[in-house]
Curated annotation (Swiss-Prot):
GO biological process, one term: fatty acid biosynthetic process
Annotated compartments: Cytoplasm; Melanosome
Chief localisation class: cytoplasm
Protein name as it appears in the record: Fatty acid synthase
Class of enzymatic activity (EC top level): transferase
Cysteines engaged in disulfide bonds, as pairs: none
Catalytic activity: acetyl-CoA + n malonyl-CoA + 2n NADPH + 2n H(+) = a long-chain fatty acid + (n+1) CoA + n CO2 + 2n NADP(+)
Function of the molecule: Fatty acid synthetase catalyzes the formation of long-chain fatty acids from acetyl-CoA, malonyl-CoA and NADPH. This multifunctional protein has 7 catalytic activities as an acyl carrier protein.
EC number: 2.3.1.85
Organism: Capra hircus
């Protein structure tokens, strides 16, 4: 179909994963904010 998302949203831990995937936070920040 050729569809490409403009962005990704998340909820709860999904927000952390989204921020990491989009390059907004580092891996260390993602791990620390999840715990």
């Amino acid at each position: 179909m050729g569809l490409r998302p403009d962005g990704i949203i998340g909820h709860s831990l999904g927000e952390v994963a989204r921020a990491y995937y989009n390059g907004r936070i580092s891996q260390e920040e993602a791990i620390l904010s999840a715990y």
